[in-house]
Amino acid sequence: GNILGRLNPETGEMKEYTLPSGTYAHSVSLDKNQTPWFLGNKNGTVGYLDLKTEKFKVYKMPDKNARDPHTGVFDDAGIFWFTLQHSNMIGRLNPKSGDIKLATLPTKGSRPYGIKLDSSGTPWVSCNGSNCLVKVDKNTMELSEIKLPGAKTHTRRLAITPDDMVFYVNSGMGKLGRYNPKNGKITLWDNPSGENS
């Protein structure tokens, strides 16, 4: 559907808000004020719901090729970082100015999917279409690609520990991986259910 839902966990009451036409949000992220931001996966937008006025504010991508915002995360400065999977891009939105910057991944078809921040606020991105992780320079948006072992490797989601170890699920090979940015070492563990898990 094309709906944003708000659940009151104390009462169980659910309130639904119809999103702008064609949005079809893939995910929702909360900023430091608990304002819900959505990523318009079908219409190239990012936006939020003002909980006081119950009205939407929508930002259109500045590039027509940036068509599918996917997953997002806020840094401590309030900057919203997000992936655009099939557009093969990473985005950066400054909510104060509305300025959006985009960067294209170096490998065609990488399909950036999940995004997390390390302890310094540096964004890390998983590649669902290629065997890579991508580190984003938070100041310049320069992208550094880390090649992961295995041509069948595809990663959707990441988790980063307090000491900045980057864990990822290798859904293409049924493994759990860990990348150590300090020494470049990659460690892999088999999932209990095997390579098709």
Specify the residue positions occupied by each region the protein language model found.
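A short loop-to-beta-strand structural motif that recurs across blades of beta-propeller domains
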Residues: N2-R6, T45-Y48, M89-R92, C132-K135, ...
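Ankyrin-repeat and related helical/solenoid repeat scaffolds used for protein-protein interactions
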Residues: G172-S197
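Conserved beta-strand positions in repeat-built beta-propeller and related beta-rich domains
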Residues: G1, P36-K42, F80-H86, P123-G129, ...
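Short loop/turn segments that connect beta-strands within beta-propeller blades
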Residues: N8-G12, D50-E54, N94-G98, D137-M141, ...
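A short beta-strand motif characteristic of beta-propeller blades
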Residues: E13-T18, K55-M61, D99-L105, E142-L148, ...
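Beta-rich, blade/repeat-based domains predominating
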Residues: S21-Q34, K64-A77, T107-S126, G150-M165, ...
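A generic tandem-repeat structural signature
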Residues: G1-I3, Y24-S29, F38-Y48
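Short intrinsically disordered, low-complexity coil segments enriched in acidic
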Residues: G1-K15, K52, E195-S197
